[in-house]
Amino acid sequence: TRSSAASDVYKRQGLNYVITILQARTRGMSLMRMPLTIWGIFTATVLALLAFPALLVSSIMMTLDKVLGTSFFMPTIIKAGEALSYDGGSPILFQHLFWFFGHPEVYIVALPAFGIVSDLISVHSRKNIFGYRMMVWAIVGIGALSFFVWAHHMYVSGMSPWFGFFFATTTLIIAVPTALKVYNWILTLWRGNIRINTVMLFCLGFILTFVNGGITGIFLGNVAVDVPL
């Protein structure tokens, strides 16, 4: 299928990025001296290598269900118009596999943008980025936590309340490194020699849009608020 082919392509390209960053840096370019753009791309690539196999597996299983009549995701198997006596699979399994890929995919797209915006703000503020190491660990932390929040998309799927509590907690925790980035962006702008040009206006618009969306995520990450809404 197309998703299986796309998953394979992403994994092959991702290996090129990871190997280049780890093994082909120029002399004197340690990991903690790399631009934040490269850190964002590197972390996003590692996420892609870990997340896309879930999409690949779910695509193969769905194809087998459709073509060969297996029952990975179909709860009831029907033959000649009648349901067979034994149970099939579960559509909830597909939701887990999809969102295990789907939520890290959000950060696969976002983390390179975070790195790019960080470097652009630094350049057009004519000031080093505030808290470089903090920014690096925030990017890495967001990437790591992204694999523990996927089921907040499934609060109404019938999961155990304890699982809902766990995923609500991890969803709120991931807001901490995210907020640190905004904090560092603002302090980089503070008393900087800012050039108000098209690039800086786009960066400021990015921050405002990101903060607006992030605030809603704090509320909707809570089961008690998300389910009624």
Indicate where each model-derived feature is located.
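Membrane-interfacial loop-to-helix junctions in multi-pass inner-membrane proteins
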Residues: L22-A48, H124-G141, S160-A168, L187-G205
